[in-house]
């Protein structure tokens, strides 16, 4: 083939088993070639290989450790079927001859493929598809088997590997049409809890490029065996293992019937359970052993229910339960077929009907086998197949660990509990559901006409994904209006403040303010003389007199209504049925209870003093109160409150002689009370010191101290101050109205604040979208999106935190779409250093030098066109035309050295033109899932058969699944 062949045989030949016979069959059907294969199968293949390939794979130069010089006839090829398949794949995939060498003419390539295929069909394989061996139940299968055996209404343990939870039975409950709207969600990051006190064994490993049900990875270590044994006991001992949650409780665990002996009852129950648990007929000695085990517990005093639990946990601890044998012996083959079908489609043990046809040996009848598979596809338990195969085939579990750099896209992980992954993962799974339910061609997984989108996905694909812009001009205009309104009201408040300052000044000295004419000198002299007498006498407080309750319509009514002569109290006067009464029990300094709702009480007393003096009155009330001194209202509050001491305090200037105190307490709903305490106010020390000095001997400062103090307490100014305080209260109330209006006015808000509000609102909008469960069916109007390749799930999980990974995307396509996984890179090849080189290089340009390494070129020539074709999608699957450095995205390439494309639409069209390759790859994946092992050259013939039988209808999903299941148990 030339001198530049790769030195890695596996890379050159594309190690996988796929894509081979379609080309041969197509050519034969077209009648374009004439082959004499019956006379000498493989003769043409040997001839073509010798003419075109020995140059690189023979003589002094043996590239890829493949020497074809000894190849003389087809017998050499039949001896090495794996090499035979590798040659077919390399030629079919056009990886051979390598780039830079002469390309085989299409007719020659087709002739070579056909001849190699005929040789493969003549290989005498030793084993059947259902090979001998055992397979342990994986977590998913174990959970489902336990649920079905006991008809449990909850999962045994949490299953984060279940990526989609369907809230409607649309898979089998409709008429072959998916609903326009479905309710689904992904609970993978917050899985529903299983049974209490039940701990699962660790999550199962994935086979390389495979599934979690593969025999070679489902091993059993001593630690894992111990976990299985503990699990079996914990299930039946769980508080959730009750008659309410176990559907077979009555048949398996209830107390025995009166018509049988205890041994007969246990034996009867265990016979049914063992048959289903072991999934095959049970020997008498096995049944007897478990029966005796249960009886041993009843003989120790346990009741039948607990004894059956012990026996059942022993059954679940048996390898015959948690292992699936793969025996090809005729006696149990039907039951192995039943288990294979059941665990493939239902992820669980066979049901009664499946065991029945197995016991009757009917599964060997092709018609019965096919009808059985079709029945199983219609059973609701097929949802478990949809929960396992599509997820693992598309490698979607990798998506759940994706965490893009918030600096690149902040919305992906905006909600830690509901990241974008829980929405994205549902799109490809719903597409698979739709193709299955509507039995569409599997080609539509690549190029569908519909998809299912949530509001979040609609925004993700179609919108700018940013908050709405703000109108700076409108904001500034609005701020001007707001500022003017605030300034207007603030001017009024300022005017009130000015008036209040003037009133406060007048209250301090009403004489200077001109509000009253009074000779304070005479009053001060009289007051000074009285202070000498004050020290010789104490306050004389009369007992309280009380009248009430006076009923009213409301608290406000009770507070405002004058039920007695409040300015001139007459203790002899009667008011209706009420009269003043002595109340010797009302002691100062205590809270006194009153009765009646919506009413008022009055209490009255006198305070006698030989000289004018100051006292402090401390009040408490439930609810409102008014206080009069010598007929003058000196304080009031109209409110609802509970009583407490010292809620309000007043300074009272008592005149020499007798002073009258009237206290009104008003109540709303319920009981009420009051508190009263009077105490003399000591003179300030400077005043006391000045009074001790003879009047003629006082200095200016002492005279000022006394005049200032008297000015503050002068009885001559009391009325003026009362009026001024009323005016002050009115001004305060009026100012409060304006201030409240001012406070309620919207404040100017900066443009930056508006942007922040818009961002917060948009963030909340996105958070709400991330929690939506409803997905709507939408037509694919934008051909850039749709299908299992160009969706946010696949594109996100094949990217890094900060940039896309074209190679990872290429690997995903070769593995998932073409079932052609590349060889791992050589150990001596360093990874790409993204920090090297100029910052303005594109990722394609950075990879250019990497691809120049001969050890890398082979794989990269296949992977790079696939990965770079998707570079218009950023790390989260959103469309972009340029990189962050401003450079345009270049997606041009060639698919399989045949299909040249300039954009992603042409790339997708190229994939569609290779639909038969995809179909064959899909069948290969599904067959591997069904047989639970890596495929062999023999399986290539099985795949040919499946492809042939489903090709006419374009490989309809249900037909493909049926045929794969049918062939997998032959």
Segments from the language model and where they lie:
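Short structured motifs
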Residues: 587-591, 602-603, 645-649
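Bacterial N-terminal signal peptides
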Residues: 19-32
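Beta-strand signatures of extracellular beta-sandwich domains
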Residues: 626-628
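N-terminal secretory signal peptides that target proteins for export/translocation
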Residues: 1-17
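Short hydrophobic alpha-helix segments
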Residues: 637-638
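Boundary at the C-terminal end of the N-terminal hydrophobic targeting segment
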Residues: 29, 35-41
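Short beta-strands within extracellular/lumenal beta-sheet-rich domains
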Residues: 597-607
């Amino acid at each position: 083939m030339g001198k530049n062949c790769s030195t890695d045989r596996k890379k050159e030949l594309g190690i996988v088993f796929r894509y081979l016979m379609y080309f041969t069959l197509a050519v034969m059907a077209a009648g374009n070639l004439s082959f004499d294969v019956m006379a000498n199968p493989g003769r043409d293949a040997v001839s073509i290989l010798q003419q075109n390939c020995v140059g690189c794979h023979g003589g002094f130069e043996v590239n890829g450790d493949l020497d074809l010089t000894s190849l003389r006839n087809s017998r050499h090829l039949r001896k090495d079927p794996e090499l035979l398949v590798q040659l077919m794949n390399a030629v079919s995939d056009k990886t051979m001859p390598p780039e830079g060498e002469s390309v085989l003419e299409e007719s020659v390539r087709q002739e070579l493929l056909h001849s190699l295929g005929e040789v493969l069909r003549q290989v005498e394989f030793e084993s059947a598809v259902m090979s001998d061996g055992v397979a342990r139940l994986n977590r998913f299968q174990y959970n489902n088997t336990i649920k079905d055996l006991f008809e449990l209404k909850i999962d045994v343990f949490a299953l984060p590997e279940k990526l989609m939870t369907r809230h409607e039975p649309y898979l089998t409950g409709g008429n072959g049409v998916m609903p326009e709207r479905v309710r689904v969600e992904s609970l993978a990051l917050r899985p529903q809890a299983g049974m209490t006190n039940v701990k699962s064994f660790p999550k199962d490993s994935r086979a390389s490029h495979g599934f979690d049900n593969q025999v070679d990875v489902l091993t059993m270590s001593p630690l894992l065996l111990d976990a299985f044994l503990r699990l079996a006991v914990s299930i039946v001992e769980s508080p959730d293992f009750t008659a309410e949650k176990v559907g077979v409780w009555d048949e398996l665990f209830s107390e025995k019937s009166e018509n049988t002996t205890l041994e007969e009852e246990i034996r009867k129950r265990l016979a049914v359970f063992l048959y289903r648990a072991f999934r095959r007929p049970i020997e008498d000695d096995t049944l007897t052993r478990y029966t005796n085990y249960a009886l041993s517990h009843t003989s120790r005093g346990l009741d039948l229910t607990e004894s059956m639990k012990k026996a059942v946990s022993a059954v679940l601890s048996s390898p015959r339960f948690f292992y699936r044998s793969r025996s090809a012996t005729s006696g149990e083959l039907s039951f192995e077929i039943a288990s294979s079908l059941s665990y493939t489609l239902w992820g669980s043990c066979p049901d009664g009907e499946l065991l029945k046809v197995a016991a009757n040996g009917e599964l060997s009848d092709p018609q019965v086998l096919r009808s059985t598979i079709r029945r199983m596809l219609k059973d609701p338990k097929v949802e478990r197949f949809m929960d396992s195969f599509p997820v693992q085939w598309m490698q979607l579990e990798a998506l759940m660990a994706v965490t893009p750099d918030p600096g690149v896209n902040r919305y992906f992980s905006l909600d830690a509990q509901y990241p974008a992954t829980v929405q994205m993962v549902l799109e490809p799974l719903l597409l698979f559901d739709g193709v299955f339910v509507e039995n569409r061609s599997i080609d539509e997984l690549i190029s569908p006409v519909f998809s299912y989108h949530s509001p979040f996905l609609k925004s993700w694909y179609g919108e700018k994904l940013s908050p709405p812009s703000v109108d700076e001009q409108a904001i500034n205009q609005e701020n001007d209006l707001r500022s003017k309104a605030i300034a207007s009201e603030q001017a009024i408040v300022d005017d009130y403040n000015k008036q209040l300052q003037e009133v406060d000044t007048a209250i301090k000295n009403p004489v200077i303010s001109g509000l009253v004419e009074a000779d304070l000198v005479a009053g001060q002299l009289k007051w000074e003389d009285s202070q000498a007498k004050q020290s010789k006498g104490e306050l004389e407080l009369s007992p309280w007199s009380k009248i009430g309750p006076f009923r009213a319509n409301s608290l406000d009514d009770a507070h405002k209504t004058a039920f007695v002569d409040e300015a001139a109290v007459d203790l002899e006067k009667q008011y209706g049925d009420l009269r003043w009464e002595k109340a010797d029990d009302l002691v100062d300094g205590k809270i006194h209870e009153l009765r009646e709702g919506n009413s008022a009480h009055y209490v009255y007393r006198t305070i006698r003093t030989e000289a004018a003096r100051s006292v402090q009155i401390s009040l408490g009330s439930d609810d409102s109160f008014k206080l009069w001194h010598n007929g003058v209202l000196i304080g009031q509050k109209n409110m609802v409150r509970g009583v407490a001491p010292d809620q309000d305090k007043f300074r009272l200037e008592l005149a020499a002689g007798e002073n009258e105190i009237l206290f009104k307490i008003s109540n709303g709903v319920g009981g009420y009370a009051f508190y009263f305490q009077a105490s003399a106010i000591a003179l300030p020390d400077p005043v006391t010191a000045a009074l001790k000095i003879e009047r003629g001997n006082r200095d200016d400062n002492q005279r000022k101290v006394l005049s200032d103090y008297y000015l503050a307490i002068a009885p001559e100014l009391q009325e003026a101050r009362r009026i001024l305080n009323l005016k002050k209260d009115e001004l305060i109330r009026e100012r409060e109205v304006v201030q409240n209006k001012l406070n309620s006015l919207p404040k100017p808000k900066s443009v930056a604040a508006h942007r922040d509000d818009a961002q917060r609102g948009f963030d909340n909008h996105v958070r709400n979208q991330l929690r939506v469960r409803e997905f709507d069916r939408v037509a694919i109007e934008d051909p850039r999106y749709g299908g299992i390749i160009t969706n946010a799930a696949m594109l996100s999980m094949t990217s890094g935190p900060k940039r896309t990974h074209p190679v990872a995307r290429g690997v995903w396509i070769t593995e998932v779409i073409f079932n052609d996984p590349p060889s791992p890179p050589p150990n001596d090849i360093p990874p790409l250093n993204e920090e090297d080189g100029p910052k303005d290089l594109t990722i394609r340009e950075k990879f250019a030098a990497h691809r120049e390494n001969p050890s890398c070129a082979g794989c990269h020539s296949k992977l790079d066109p696939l990965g770079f074709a998707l570079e218009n999608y950023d790390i989260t699957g959103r469309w972009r035309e340029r990189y962050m450095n401003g450079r345009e995205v270049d997606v041009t390439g060639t698919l399989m050295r045949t299909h040249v494309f300039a954009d992603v639409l042409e790339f997708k069209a190229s994939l569609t033109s290779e639909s038969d390759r995809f179909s064959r790859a899909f069948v290969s994946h599904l067959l591997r899932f069904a047989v639970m092992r890596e495929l062999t050259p023999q399986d290539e013939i099985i795949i040919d058969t499946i492809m042939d039988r489903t090709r006419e209808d374009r490989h309809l999903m249900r037909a493909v699944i049926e045929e794969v299941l049918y062939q997998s148990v032959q």
